[in-house]
Amino acid sequence: MSLIDWFAARRKDQFVGKVSQDTDEGDGLWVKCSECSQVAYRKDLISNFNVCSNCNHHNRINSDERINIVADKDSFKEFDSSLSPTDPLGFKDRRSYADRIKDSQTSTGLRDGVITGFCSVNSMPLALAVMDFRFMGGSMGSVVGEKITRIIERATKKNYPILIVCASGGARMQEGMLSLMQMAKISGALKKHKEKNLLYMPLLTHPTTGGVTASFAMLGDLILAEPKALIGFAGRRVIEQTLREKLPDNFQTAEYLLEHGFVDVIVKRRELKTTLTKILKIHGVNELVEANI
């Protein structure tokens, strides 16, 4: 091997071999966009809110990153952090549900797939729930449903607006009917919140599907979505096989739902806090909170 070939091999090992396909995987210096295949310096991607500067693809981010984008610095106060799922049905497919819970808790550092709490957005109060797709696909089980219900009830008592960041594959099948009941429970809590004329906003991120879409994700006074997010109930193939029709290429995207009136506004990630600030000011959030003191 010539000296030039040796240097070329070394260079390939140092750079090409460390390109990651996902911002959540590995610790390489470079990340390859799953949408346009553009290779970006990881630190540049993170500083751009994990959005590809070439094609504007919004990569998945975790719950902590979401909170940092929305909440004022050091303003987030978490509730119900000790709640953890159990296995009431003794469910087992290829692996037991209990083992899946442990694996997800170990890999994510979370107890379940949502973080809830109060925060401020440019000094205006907000009740915040952030689903995390890393934990069993963001599926909604009894703990996720209970935590979201509790934060809604707390917000109702204090006249706080609510933002729920949705990222979910739907109801958690390992909990059967217990997971399905969370749809009704959360919807009931939102109805009481609405009866006080308080603001509720879901933010639909990629993906938002199944029982989450069929319940609280579509009950907002103002429904926000991230660009190109997959939003739907059943999967595309299931619908095509049932209807025996070819669906449009952009079917179940945020843009398609905006065009057909199911989404009110598409918000780029870097503009989210500014958009929320405008909405909260228009709704006179501080005045509502003061009236409840």
From Swiss-Prot:
Documented EC number(s): 2.1.3.15
Chain intervals annotated as zinc finger (C4-type): 33-55
Function of the molecule: Component of the acetyl coenzyme A carboxylase (ACC) complex. Biotin carboxylase (BC) catalyzes the carboxylation of biotin on its carrier protein (BCCP) and then the CO(2) group is transferred by the transcarboxylase to acetyl-CoA to form malonyl-CoA.
Predominant cellular place of this UniProt entry's protein: cytoplasm
Subcellular location: Cytoplasm
Gene name linked to the record: accD
Residue stretches making up the CoA carboxyltransferase N-terminal domain: 29-293
GO biological process: fatty acid biosynthetic process; malonyl-CoA biosynthetic process
Subunit structure: Acetyl-CoA carboxylase is a heterohexamer composed of biotin carboxyl carrier protein (AccB), biotin carboxylase (AccC) and two subunits each of ACCase subunit alpha (AccA) and ACCase subunit beta (AccD).
Keywords recorded for this protein, A-Z: ATP-binding, Cytoplasm, Fatty acid biosynthesis, Fatty acid metabolism, Lipid biosynthesis, Lipid metabolism, Metal-binding, Nucleotide-binding, Transferase, Zinc, Zinc-finger
Positions that bind Zn(2+): C33, C36, C52, C55
Protein name: Acetyl-coenzyme A carboxylase carboxyl transferase subunit beta
Entry-linked PROSITE patterns: COA_CT_NTER
Sequence intervals crossing the membrane: none
Cellular component terms per the entry's GO annotation: acetyl-CoA carboxylase complex
Family the entry assigns: Belongs to the AccD/PCCB family.
NCBIfam families tied to this protein: accD (TIGR00515)
The organism of origin for this protein: Prochlorococcus marinus (strain MIT 9215)
